[in-house]
């Protein structure tokens, strides 16, 4: 009992304590191995840095160590830090050995030495300065990365970022051992790179007249009336590439093709299929204007790449390849003539032809091609590397074909998603991606055979910027989840554990706050688990991390330090508003959570059968659609909404112990065409006398409402029955001229109220 109490105290107060013996465990990403030893090294003004002659200490690291009062010295003395390179072992690996009078940092190569320096900096950052020195416990850290590609993508197309923003992002990347910066430089909404041969790309394509305010799906749309844009000169790009290189980061440019090209076509209409004059779009979403596969277009793109390639030493050039609508190609005589000439069976094959031509050109320049997973459509270019974003399916397919893969699935790696269900979260594109879920990501899927693992180069987090226009918001949306991803990509799977990571993460968040850099901190939030029972709704409250205690109210008021402490699950039997929050030492922490329970007849029903939702969007489980809880109005991935697998019709059959006097049924549906989620056109209620044979009782037609994201559909239906069935078919194939056209539409449902 005494031992258990000691463990509990450790868990509760670990985030607020400093344990010298665990100092190596403060590092993010967690090293492969940390072995403690007796004694301490005292880092002070008397500490000298001694490096081999061929080692160049980066300027910024030099400056950091000087701030810590260390002295650069070529002669080894007591209290030294010794830098060396072994030129053996796995690339990027290192050993950091701290003894009582010396610190030995040995890199397997220059990259390994650099990452060892990052670990040393973290050790110094997280130890207090006492009497003019920092005390570091003796230990040996042996470390190397799990994956060779550890990337972050920044979208400069939607919003142009000043150089200072990018440099800060690169600093954070370097500190947490990311080694690749994927720079998304062209988009429908803006062209961001200087091309001397095509000056209108800078004068026209780089600027839009104004920008939509609020979410893209909000209607009517409102605009800010302010011209926005900018581009990076070749000198700017060289400066960023050099800045990144000093931090061991390779910069990969992305020049989008054949889709996401409206900004370029606005400057040079002959590149498109219609020849119409266009403006750079003021709002978001996939646009139908794409490059037409003419020789003039290929000449333009080759000219662009010819100017781009010398700026970037990276072996790769990213050509996009995603979300390319085929409508204009279907209608274009030129595109159809190319298909006939090349013997291409459809527009997917035309896209493949387009990508293969660009890959062949890049090969002549000594570069390799990366594309988003849509480049698989119609046949993959011979040596292309696939960046899998639409889940992991594309990555698995490419690996089976023998192609290299960078895993970047939106469900784990899109940092423009919401981080929490809490009210007051800043506007995001939608969905939800918690730091815990990012941490659970494994770039190597279980279903991938061992012999294909070598093709998984690593992973990448993506910062799409439709809703990220400022540096503070970029920090809030990206940095915390970047730290989780850094450990995914560096640390051995067997060493990963979320709770110890959360302890370290909390310390790092606090450290950066002292530098006036605010990370999001959702570690103190509470996860409610809702279980629908015949007698009501059972609410189980679980903290993300077990620090402090949970307090709650049942009357809709905010919890205080004197509110009830949560001990056991709550059973709600009547209309109730639960509010709950974490408290540490009687102080509220994290965001409060609200649960609005509205009971109805469906809670007492037995589910005879129900369409199984997609594994990705299964909501609150089997009874989640009749649990008395409504989902978010702006997040379809909030844990309540259920996504029906595209192509399926939703059906749910309910039964009661006796006949029920029912007045009608109400359900909520989600409307987000940009995410391929469409409103259904109809819904039908059926009744049965025996639970086997059902007949139509009531139906309703659903009119598309473009002005709302969630729609409540009410079906008045006065019946008395023991058995009912609700059927809601998805619209099927997404029509032409709509986002996702040609694909099967998603249907998302929320609470089905039987009243």
What are these regions (language model features)?
Residues 634-696, 704-755:
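Aromatic, loop-rich ligand-recognition surfaces of beta-strand-rich domains
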Residues 89-298, 302-316, 357, 361, ...:
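Feature activates predominantly on carbohydrate-active enzymes
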Residues 368-374, 379-384, 390-538:
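Flexible, acidic glycine-rich loops studded with aromatic residues
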Residues 264-269, 281-282, 287-382, 389-397:
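Active-site neighborhood of glycoside hydrolase catalytic domains
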Residues 1-26:
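Bacterial Sec-dependent N-terminal signal peptides
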Residues 24-147, 473, 489-499, 503, ...:
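Contiguous, structured surface segment used for ligand recognition
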Residues 109, 582-586, 730-732:
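Surface-exposed loop/turn motifs at beta-strand-loop junctions within extracellular Ig-like
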Residues 492, 496-651, 670, 679:
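Short, compositionally stereotyped local motifs that mark structural "simplifiers"
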